[in-house]
Amino acid sequence: MELGNYTVIDTILESKVRILSSLFGGCDGDHDVRCRHDLSLAARADVYSSLVLFLRGRFRRSVRPPRQPGNNIDVYLRPLVEELLQLWHEEGVPVWDEHEQKEFNLRGLLFVTINDWPALSNISGQSNKGYNACTHCLGETDSMYLGNKNVYLGHRRFLPRQHVVRMGGGKHFRGEADNRTKPTRPTGDVMYDMVKDLKVIFGKGPGGQSVPNDSAGHVPMWKKMSIFWELPYWKILEVHSSIDVMHVTKNLCVNLLNFLGVYGKTKDTPDARQDQQRMHERDNLNPEKYQGPASYALTKEEKEIFFEVLSSIKVPSGFSSNIKGIINMTEKKFQNLKSHDCHVIMTQLLPIALRGLLPENVRVPIVKLCVFLNAISQKVIDQESLTRLQKDVVQCLVSFELVFPPSFFNIMTHLLVHLVDEIAILGPVFLHNMFPFERFMGVLKKYVHNRARPEGSISKGYGTEEVIEFCVAPP
């Protein structure tokens, strides 16, 4: 509607359409804009142009950043695979062995991939959620759906066949025996037969094609055939993607501290109690009008002792972050936990702080688990002790099944049972976890001084440091 020298806009929606449409051209600067309800859109032509420029800048800043490729990572890995194929050829590169005093052919291979849990699924092509989320058990994963999540139980089958708990002795597990055999990890040839016929078209557009769910609506075990299967030696490797102990320890620490009631919101909820009621397990924890405290939850007095012990601990410089900075003495809870903080808590501090606290059937398995994590984190591991370590961690998980509700047993808790097998194949944990890569990423981030050009800043900073090291190095 025209009113003198102004154009009156009837609705706010129309005003938004007029202004936003000018972002894509067609802006008419000869008219002034005035809203009938005296909004701030009333302006002369110069102010209107400034508003349009301001909205253009806001619109550009609101554009979503590039998303992670997810399962389409194979498209970006194509150049890497081509270089790996060049490193692995029949004749190899002749290299002189000074010790043997003879020449041999040198070839390079990709020994194992190291990723966190979501990236492991994208790289390997195996699903990391649902009923078959375990990368070792595959189709033999013991899982059930409770409380809107999958839980992974059945760790008794990893015990020796004649173990009293497995045979159903005593009152545990309702006296039922578990005669199942321990799942065996399939060989590379068997895994290749599982994925060789999968047809996947990469891309998130209309042309993309993924592996559909099964007849029951469950997530498929394999989402794609990984590009690394093109490598001729990939079938021979016993472990393709290692379990990242750093993230497993952090998730386990947070999960355990949540149930102890000293970090975040407690997971001892009525829904968790109802899961046990559905399974007919531990009737003493069934929900009532008054939800009684669980045996694994610290009381108010125990929390006082627990955090007083932690606040009094003094560690050497560089051993860990400031312990007083990660605990809140007022609320009696942990705060701002990082991966290394969880590593120090689980391997060193938690067994000390829990001495004399909690019932023995709860405290002893937790302490044994901390001892296990400390043992596998050493740089030197005796191969003869691996059998004992495997036995200890299985007994800890079985003891946890007798104490904690099913919601405690997420996939990260279940992966503990497979760590010793990977150590026997790949070596000590420090050789195949994420700590070295996270530290190096921290070094690269310090090179970024221009946030608009992070790649250029990293390249320039890394090159400058390399030149300085070359110049100051002794001849």
Where are the language model's segments positioned?
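A short acidic (Asp/Glu
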Residues: 40-44, 73, 121-123, 445
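Conserved, folded interaction/cargo-binding domains in eukaryotic regulatory proteins
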Residues: 365-370, 415, 429, 434
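A cross-family structural signal marking well-folded subdomains
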Residues: 350-354, 361-362, 366, 370, ...
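Acidic, metal-ligating active-site segments
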Residues: 8-11, 19-66, 136-139, 470
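Domain-level detector for long, ordered catalytic/regulatory cores in large eukaryotic signaling
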Residues: 1-8, 13-16, 24, 78, ...
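Active-site beta-loop-alpha junctions of metal-dependent nucleic acid enzymes
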Residues: 63-79
